[in-house]
């Protein structure tokens, strides 16, 4: 039963990290790709906390699989964050840009135009438009962080002591 529950920590970390990233973008207006590293950390720690009772500390082959799982969940968390960013923030930001370019444009008209522009593209196109090359770099670092947290025995021991496991 414990082995079935083990990946839930990574999934919860990915979802929580993605939501927090999208909210950060909504609150500040900055994409802040470096927050992806936090998604990797949340995913790795979540995976580690839920796996701690199911896998022996020195079972390297099992921890390697857990580390790959954490890396996959980190990627999923980044996509969740980008998807929610588009869902929550694309139309208001397009409307703000329209009003900045056309000072006489009313907010209702700008939102209507923004919704038309938004509906003309797929979510994937909007996600690509809202990503920079630095986001890819931070995404790779996030994947490494998630992998490293779960695979490195010293980090595991620190988390175990903090989490009260083993």
Segments the model singles out, each with a brief description of its role:
Residues 1-43:
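Transmembrane alpha-helical insertion/packing segments
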Residues 42, 48-166:
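Core subunits and conserved enzymes of cellular information-processing
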């Amino acid at each position: 039963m414990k082995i079935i529950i083990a990946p839930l920590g990574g999934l919860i970390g990915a979802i929580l990290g993605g939501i927090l990233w999208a909210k950060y973008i909504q609150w500040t207006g900055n994409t802040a790709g470096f927050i992806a590293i936090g998604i990797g950390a949340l995913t790795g720690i979540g995976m580690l906390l839920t796996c701690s009772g199911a896998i022996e500390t020195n079972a390297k082959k099992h921890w390697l699989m857990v580390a790959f799982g954490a890396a996959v969940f980190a990627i999923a968390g980044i996509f969740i964050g980008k998807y929610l960013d588009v869902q929550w923030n694309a139309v208001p930001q397009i409307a703000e840009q329209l009003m900045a370019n056309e000072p006489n444009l009313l907010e209702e008209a700008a939102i209507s135009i923004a919704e038309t522009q938004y509906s003309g593209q797929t979510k994937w196109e909007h996600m690509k438009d809202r990503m920079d090359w630095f986001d890819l770099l931070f995404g790779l670092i996030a994947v490494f962080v998630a992998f490293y947290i779960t695979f490195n025995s010293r980090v595991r021991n620190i988390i175990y002591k903090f989490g009260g496991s083993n």
